[in-house]
Amino acid sequence: MAKVLYEKDIQDGVLKNKKIAVIGYGSQGHAHAMNLRDSGYDVVVGLRPGKSQEKAEEDGFNVLSVAEASSQADVVMVLLPDEMQPKVYEESIKDNLEQGNALVFAHGFNIHFTQVVPPANVDVFLVAPKGPGHLVRRTFEEGAGVPALYGVHQDYTGEAKDVALAYSKGIGAARAGVLETSFQEETETDLFGEQAVLCGGVTSLIKAGFETLTDAGYQPEVAYFECLHEMKLIVDLLYEGGLENMRYSISDTAQWGDFVSGQRVVDDQTKERMKSILDDIQTGSFAKGWILENQAGRPQFNAINRRENRHPIETVGRELRELMPFVKQPINAKKKDVNVHVPN
């Protein structure tokens, strides 16, 4: 059984006199920077000019270029999208690291797949909150926190684990519990969860259910409610108390259907395909494909994204959500094509 550490288990003195540079001010970046500052740490934010810089300055931070922030800091937390990190590291961080500094990530992708290769004379660790940035910030302000994983890739100073734990405590994660992992485990399990279950698996299941009902002549609006809209009700029950809580809360008819039909949808062949997905992740095949896709300007990514946004379930969903004012509207209901922009 994995050991979970809490605030009482962590000594944070090792981080108290260090300056922390948070590179990036998006969902995780703003939460880490604000929580660390509220915990009493000296925080500087590294960004290029733009809206994020304006927001960070409005929030009271000293905002510098990535290079300047990295050169001033003892601990450099990189909270940029995976695909941006290698170039930013090479151009703005690498030459500004000093002996004994700590290079930190919230996801192990670029270290594990050697897209970022740090010098041998720095510590390298990860602190990965298991929740979005807005939740990391909100729970911190409420006196709670979001659990996190931490792991050490390189321990030059002999203090990497202690600094990682202190950082976890600083962002509020130790209030909820921190669990030790490795860069390999965090990266491979995170990618698998996204692809096979949380994102790829769920979206494909929802679309297949919707298409099955509409192909059989049922109204698209009804199919939307049954296969997508009600998903939140079930997920909330799972989140609160696992499978048992969900099954306790639904009708006996629904539970019996779960027992006899669920295994017909996800069977041994599905599990074999999941193993194939995991193998692609473990061998680096997925990472290689994603890296090459970005280098080519994301032609497949953008084409698939446009096609998915035109799926009938999206059209029906947008129309129905306009009739439901109680449903929080998305910030960007129609995702635009994505190109990689690198900060200075």
UniProtKB/Swiss-Prot annotation:
Gene Ontology MF: a single term: NADP binding
Binding-site list for Mg(2+) 2: D190, E226, E230
InterPro entries: 6-PGluconate_DH-like_C_sf (IPR008927), KARI (IPR013023), KARI_C (IPR000506), KARI_N (IPR013116), KARI_prok (IPR014359), NAD(P)-bd_dom_sf (IPR036291)
Keyword annotations: Amino-acid biosynthesis, Branched-chain amino acid biosynthesis, Magnesium, Metal-binding, NADP, Oxidoreductase
Enzymatic class: oxidoreductase
Gene Ontology CC annotations of this record: cytosol
Cofactor: Mg(2+)
Protein role: Involved in the biosynthesis of branched-chain amino acids (BCAA). Catalyzes an alkyl-migration followed by a ketol-acid reduction of (S)-2-acetolactate (S2AL) to yield (R)-2,3-dihydroxy-isovalerate. In the isomerase reaction, S2AL is rearranged via a Mg-dependent methyl migration to produce 3-hydroxy-3-methyl-2-ketobutyrate (HMKB). In the reductase reaction, this 2-ketoacid undergoes a metal-dependent reduction by NADPH to yield (R)-2,3-dihydroxy-isovalerate.
Entry protein name: Ketol-acid reductoisomerase (NADP(+))
Gene: ilvC
